[in-house]
């Protein structure tokens, strides 16, 4: 499924060797995916239980995932333009 694909991407990314300048890009990308996975775990708990706290945790984690991804993209663009 989708989560398994994300986990495979993380495993591949963690094995990937990149230039020192690009390590923060890769690390932010990994952090983004890890937060996305955790978000889905909490969202599933919310769907099953109706617990609004789980929904809030899910949304917060998804927001963190977006922020990490945005940082990765911005760092990459800076490196490519620099």
Give each language-model segment a name.
Residues 30-40:
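Extended, hydrophobic/aromatic-rich amphipathic alpha-helical segments that build helical scaffolds
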Residues 1-2, 38-82:
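C-terminal amphipathic alpha-helix
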Residues 3-30, 78-82:
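Short, solvent-exposed, charged loop/turn and helix-capping segments
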